[in-house]
Curated annotation (Swiss-Prot):
Family per similarity comment: Belongs to the RNase HII family.
Gene designation per UniProt: rnhB
Species in which this protein is naturally found: Mycoplasma capricolum subsp. capricolum (strain California kid / ATCC 27343 / NCTC 10154)
Record localization: Cytoplasm
Stored Pfam families: RNase_HII
Listed cofactors: Mn(2+); Mg(2+)
Molecular function terms, GO-annotated: manganese ion binding; RNA binding; RNA-DNA hybrid ribonuclease activity
Protein name, UniProt field: Ribonuclease HII
Organism classification: Bacteria, Bacillati, Mycoplasmatota, Mollicutes, Mycoplasmataceae
Cofactor binding annotation: Manganese or magnesium. Binds 1 divalent metal ion per monomer in the absence of substrate. May bind a second metal ion after substrate binding.
Amino acid sequence: MINRKSFDDQIKLDHNITYLSGSDEAGRGCLAGPLVVASVILKPDYFNPLIKDSKKLNPKTRQVLFDEIIKNCLDYQIMIISSKQVDELNPLQASLLGFKTTISNLKITPDLALIDGNQNINLENIKTLSIIKGDDNSFSIACSSILAKVTRDKILDQYDQIYPNYGFKSHKGYCTKKHLLAIQKYGVLDIHRKSYKPIKKISKETS
C-alpha cells in the first residue's frame, strides 16, 4: 500500500520546505461539462489513509472526504472552466490555466507546488514539480483530485436535472455508448465540447 503522506513528507525534507500544495483536474477527457481544477495546501499533521485517487472512491466516500479535506486544509482553490473555454483554449491549455490560476490564488504561497501529470508549468516565484500518476503517489494531489471530482460531479448532477434524456448522472459527461446514443437522438447541447471528435462527427452527421 502506497503511503502518500510519506511521499509528500519526503519531498518536504528533500527540498527543505514548509508549504507544499497539490493540484489535479477532473473532466479533461469528457465530451460535456466543465473542466475543474483544484489546488490545496493541507495542515501538516493531517492524514487519512482512505484518501487516494478520487476515481477509485465511491461517490459517498468522496463527499465525506471532500468535507474533511476542506476542514483540514490551510487553503484551497477550485476553478471551473466551461466547455466553451475548453474548446477555445484546447484541453491541455485549459488545464494549465486552471493549475496556474488556482496555485497563484492560494492565500498561502506554497514553497513547492505538486501537479498531477507530466507537463512543466512555469509560475513566477513558485516552484512546481509535475508528478506522473500524482493522485496515486502524493497525498496532497490525491486530496486535490477529490476536491475537483466532487465539484464537477455536482455540476453534472445538476445538468442531469436540466437535460434528463442524456444520462449525465451516470456517465458524468464522459464518452460512453449511452452518452453518444443520447447525443445522436436528442442533439448536441451548449455544454458539449464542440472541438472534440465524437461531437464533431455527430454534428456533421446530423447537419
